[in-house]
């Protein structure tokens, strides 16, 4: 391909600087391409020139939310890799250490042509070092250096991105932080997505603490600090990315973070006239504020604009055309479902035991058993994942344009030196790019500082709930959110619970009814019980703010007016596909006597002690009322 002269040596650098600040108000974490060696700490055992395992470090590429990213090469093959060094301090509490290491091993099984591969994991006392595929460029630098990107070219990138995201969602992994720095390009101009699966291992799964100050790509439910963010958040980010490729600017961009947040929360953006109706229509369906109404990845793959010139290897198994349909009918049921009605493939068992460290007889046992234990399910998942990799490879072989890249895709370990000769010439990043990179870093860092101190964020602080309302983000548990697209077998799978971890409780009541029906039921119950509520705003359809008179009974001292209107907030969350949670929250008191002065002189402690019983009492009444109604229906 003529573009082998690498997008880093851009003569277009002169004009790229004025676009750049648009896409990169964020902490630039590793288009594994920047040359930013100032971050090095010479005393560290990870200094330039140091050896880790079979790798020798060349330089630091950048620093991300998880720690430094270094360029290194394999001492015998000369193969370039990137090392992502995760300091164990940033990881969730120490009792999660085992889970995190399992989770990172699970990521080693992900094999998709458009995902950065994880070759190996090296553990030390303080760090986990991920050895990952090296890709020299960022998609967005490439966009900026082009005068304009045709819809055709943008669609090719977009198809690759969506296919990779679909693949991960199918394997219960949500990215949650898709943004330009995570979209890299290899020398064939193929997209490679970095950091899939990593948002799960950050402390408390709190996105805002860990995201690098790039709210421009974050979905409304992420910036509002909602407790649950499922596959829908990736759809939103992909919508923003498609918009940027086609329009060369961000749909949501404002110097003021509060204004930016407001625009994102209300979905306020403009579509330029020059977009084709197909592209504009797709963007509109992706940037829908309410995640329940947003298009799904699966639906995107069936969109007409998306399907133009779509290479078949990008399709998931259930969307692939089957030429030999007739005789496949009886097999097709097995295809995506459980491995037990199929011959067990010994090769797969070997791969599984070497990558994940399971005992072989443990693997055979779990594949032959129909028992539904978390440990067995985890092994079955992993087996199915590898099995599917095999069929993906078959598809890729059939696709001429892709088959020459098969070698790198297949390799469990990095490819050999010969394949690398071309890219060695690229590592000389010219001086101008480096200077620009430094400038961009500087602006990203100041940008980030203002973002974290913005007073607007303060109003979210007290809403930070320590209650975990929603399931943990283990990749295995994300299956729950994926069931809609999943195989019939998926519904048998129960989340993995490690012995140490405590049971996660759901607070509130769960429902499988349609969300609008649930809300309707709640309003009927509230009306029957004589509560009042504020009219909900368009974006708060799923939240009810209400007042409810609570009769305190024996008023000994009539002068002392005890506030008697309890305020509550009821909110509907989506826990997983077709499974919702109604959450009740105490929200203070008002007085029906019309003067709120009395409320303020009760101390907060007194207030909460005094409120616990009334709150539970009213909540119970409401739940009973809902139960009665649902039976009478």
From Swiss-Prot:
The modification Phosphoserine is found at residues 413, 487, 632. Residues 348-389 form the UBA domain. Its EC number is 2.7.11.1. GO terms for cellular component: cellular bud neck septin ring; cytoplasm; mitochondrion; nuclear envelope lumen; nuclear membrane; nucleotide-activated protein kinase complex; nucleus; vacuolar membrane. Residues 1-16 have a biased composition (Low complexity). The modification Phosphothreonine is found at residue 210. SMART domains: S_TKc. Residues 313-392 are annotated as: Auto-inhibitory domain (AID). It is found in: Cytoplasm; Nucleus; Nucleus membrane. The active site is at 177 (proton acceptor). Component of the AMP-activated protein kinase complex also known as the SNF1 kinase complex (Snf1c), a heterotrimeric complex composed of an alpha subunit (SNF1), a regulatory subunit beta (GAL83 and substoichiometric alternate beta subunits SIP1 and SIP2), and a regulatory subunit gamma (SNF4). Interacts with the transcriptional activator SIP4. Interacts with SAK1. Interacts with CTK1: Interacts with adenylate cyclase CYR1. This is Carbon catabolite-derepressing protein kinase.
